[in-house]
Amino acid sequence: MNIEKVTFISPDLPYPTLVTHALFAEFGMPLIATIVRDAGYDVKAFVEHIGPVKWDQVMESDVVCFHAFSASIPTTVEYIKKIRAARPDMPIILGGTHASVMAEDTLQYCDVVIRQEGDETLPEVLAKWREDKDLSDVLGVTYWDNGHVRHNPDRPYTHDIDTITDLELIDGYMDWSKPKLLWKQRMRFQLLQTSRGCPFACTFCIAPRELGQGYRMRSVDSVIADIKYQKDLVGTRYFFIVDNHFTVNRAHSKVLLQRIINEKINWAAVCFTRLEVSRDDEMLRLLKQAKIGTLYIGLESFDDNVLKLLNKQQDRESIEKAVKKIKSFGLNVLGSFVLGSDSDTVESIRKTIDTAIEQDVDYLALFPLSGYPEYNAPTIPLNRFFMPTWDKLDGNFVIFLPKNMKPSTLQREVSASYKRFFSPKQILRKLVQRKFYGALKRLGYAIQVWEIRKASNKRADYLETIEGQYYDENEQLIESMLGEEGVHPAQFPGSSMGAGLENAVIGGD
């Protein structure tokens, strides 16, 4: 097969999220595009929230590769149909979290699914096709073989993660001038990866399935070069470190932080980490000096029963102590919370938000419990999922039947919690504390979450029309109404997901 032109497409998400107003090049797809370009192919990359897909260029491709989040699967399928209508024989490849978890379901729309990391797998697939060889010995793929689905063994996780992404491969990336950013109400954020994997196994988290629990570190020299490259390219100082847990290997993190300090890198960064970071004073001091000023931490809840169910290995007392310690070093805490587990009630959710305010958590991100049918069964039983379409699986919408409240109630609690945390009263509180920059950032967050709240309330209105038969007068789930297969875990037009689940009782809004 003649393969020279390879095009990558990442469709936009259909609903607002906490990063809707951020302009950034999502990490995975542009990196894989860079690796494929370096392997000798003519590469084009379209990230739709940066710029529109240029379909004339897509149709001239030899292979089209999609990176799709679950919420963008419906759009991805539309785009694939558009390509197939014009180029019926165009080879199409899908990758990303959704494809990794739902490989066989995703395969119905494409020729090959790249599972988990694509750094080595995609170049190998392209090389095999160039040589007209089959994919029988390619690890990490699910593909069609004469009408049969082949699911090859997983590929060992990639250890060479030092490649610096060429951001100029992304069509339109350099077209965002400061006036355009201001006009479109967008703010540049650069993404940086210093490691992959997470050694923890929280029951609700998909990261171990996608990137593995084997923790791999990028070389310090490569990280520093990447920071400098991105700063020089676009002139911004705002970075988000996308590692699942930036401080897992404390010795490595400290070497990197000291190097950032020594290099006098002028930036402002956010990183993901865990509460354990609070036990290391030197780490906290280095984070502050290295200008990684906000720690994004999965607090999840201030209710001990919820924390135990989620396997977080932390309790309310340890969270409060850790938050106080982190903030004493002048660092901000962005706490994320998972709402709606079987140990959650309306009262426990409200107490969690009240405690977050009392503990002076600086920012928060709220997520109704989510996941994939079967994979997240320990946290959400299979018979309690309902997803009429994948577009609601973006972390903001309720996609299951909670045990202790109706779905609409949980959806409205998300909206109300955002409203309370980012209220004018709380912004004024920051001003009284003379935390002027913090007040300004809270105001910015309030504007962003307003869009989420609007979509959340609309979803709640719909849920109210279809949930009643499953709950008693105290909003307790009547599990006998569900049966073994329960409500439909997903019904997407033409989808095989949930095939055989005839009792599709919940539709879409």
Model-identified regions with their sequence ranges:
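Glycine- and acidic-residue-enriched helix-capping/strand-helix junction motifs
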Residues: 15-29
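Glycine-rich beta-alpha loop elements in corrinoid/cobalamin-binding modules
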Residues: 4-5, 32-160, 368-374
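Residues at the N-termini of beta-strands
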Residues: 5, 63, 112, 236-238, ...
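Radical SAM [4Fe-4S] cluster-binding motif and immediate context
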Residues: 168-334, 341, 354
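Flexible glycine/acidic-rich beta-alpha junction loops that bind and position SAM and/or redox cofactors
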Residues: 15, 200, 251, 305, ...
